[in-house]
A protein has these predicted regions:
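Catalytic core of pol beta-like nucleotidyltransferases
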Residues: 1-29, 35-41, 52-97
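Periplasmic OmpA-like peptidoglycan-binding domain that tethers envelope proteins to the cell wall
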Residues: 43-45
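Short hydrophobic/aromatic beta-strand micro-patches
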Residues: 48-50
């Protein structure tokens, strides 16, 4: 799926992906308005992850919260597999890393 991400979000997405992969995430996904195209002023960046080592979620979430220009909503798909399955079924999740 080709995403048309507005420039103001691109650097945060790349930085978040790199941080999450460096912290051990096996997979990083985008979902929400940046995937559906329903972007509004002030939209956040919805990121889903799989395979983050135990005990690291709140550490990386706080780093994303304080280090990024845009608000990041981080969801652990390992803990929310039904949510991931629903997004995947309707085609509103894209793996980015």
């Amino acid at each position: 799926m080709e995403l048309n991400i507005p420039p103001k979000y691109r650097q945060d997405i790349e930085n978040a992906k790199n941080l999450l992969k460096n912290e051990g995430c096996e997979a990083v996904f985008l979902f929400g308005s940046l995937v559906t195209g329903n972007i509004r002023d002030g939209s956040d960046i919805d990121i889903g992850i799989k395979g983050l080592p135990k005990g690291k979620f709140f550490e990386v979430y706080s780093r994303l919260y304080f280090d990024m220009e845009n608000k990041i909503d981080l969801v652990d798909f390992d803990m929310n597999s039904d949510f991931y399955s629903m997004l995947d079924k309707i085609g509103e999740v894209v793996q980015i890393g």
